[in-house]
Every structure is written in C-alpha cells, then in structure tokens.
Amino acid sequence: MPVASKLLLSILLPLPLLSLAAVAPAAEPPAAPAARMTSAECEVWARELSFAQSVADHDAAAFAAHLEPDAAFAAESPQPQRGRDLIASRWAGLIEGKTLLLSWYPSRTTIGGADDVAVSSGPALYEDLRPGADPRYRIGAFHSVWHKGADGAWRILFDDGIEPQPASDAQVAAFRQGRKPVCPQG
C-alpha cells in the first residue's frame, strides 16, 4: 500500500471511534486522594480552625492574635490591607457578624523547605443575614501563608481568597459536611 494511503487510513480509521467517544457518557473523574499531613502541618490546620472560630465567636482580640504584626490581607489586590491593626479594623464588621457571617475551614495545609512557613487553603461560606437577601449564601475559597514565630505560635502573614459566587442549597450542605474537626494526619 502506498505511503499516502497508509497515512490517510491512519487518519480516517480512528474517526468512528472518536465519534463514539463524543456520544458516550463521560465518566466521573476519580475522586482526589484524601490529604495526609505531617504533625507540623496539623498544627497549622488546628491554628486555621482556631482562626475561623475567632470569627464565629465574634472575638476581635482572638482574631487579631492570629495575625503577624506586618500581615497583608487581600494580598493579591492592588491595595492590600497591611498591618494587624488595620486588618482588624477593616474586619471588625465581619467579626461582629450582624449582617454577614463568614465561616471557613482548611482542606489542605502544606509546609515546604522552610519549616517556619506554611500554606493553608480551603472553602469559605458567606451568609447574608439581611431579610430577603438574594443570594443568601455565597461560596468562595481562601489561601493563607502562615509564619511560625520565635514563640512557636503560627500567625498569618498573607491572606487572600477567591471571589465568592452564589451557592445552591446543595453546595451549602456540602460545605457544612466537608469540615473535618481533626487533621487527616498520615
């Protein structure tokens, strides 16, 4: 068979298979493997949960205690909030929780080559408490960089997140069911 014919056949023969693949139902992607963290990463996990609890408890002093003095929030924005005092001031209304509740939890914490720096990330749920709020719930995500101080305490150095989007009842339920109170150490 001439080379041109072999080339044409090699191109045309797979086409029916591609057509079948296009109409076949897509398989669900495999579930992501569960995160397994070191004991040091679990310290950061616990600290992230403690930070979230400070907002849930409307405790401004505990919130501020989780921040490095020179922390930067909205770190990827053109005008980050810089410094513990400014951040605590800007978050005061959110910490009060009178019109908006924010809750979050880590889904992953990671420590790399520097044992005093860690990254945490996970989902965040915003609940608008105003009567008739639409949407009532919005889901986003956060990512934080933690620094372990000379006193051994982990504090946030940088924080940012993903713009929240309206959330369905199923997404809200999945968020609430996804919180793990114990770090998945492995």
Please place each PLM-identified region on the residue numbering.
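N-terminal secretory signal peptides that target proteins for export/translocation
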Residues: 1-5
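A beta-strand edge to alpha-helix "cap/lid" segment located at domain peripheries
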Residues: 27-65, 72-186
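Boundary at the C-terminal end of the N-terminal hydrophobic targeting segment
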Residues: 21-26
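Bacterial N-terminal signal peptides
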Residues: 9-20
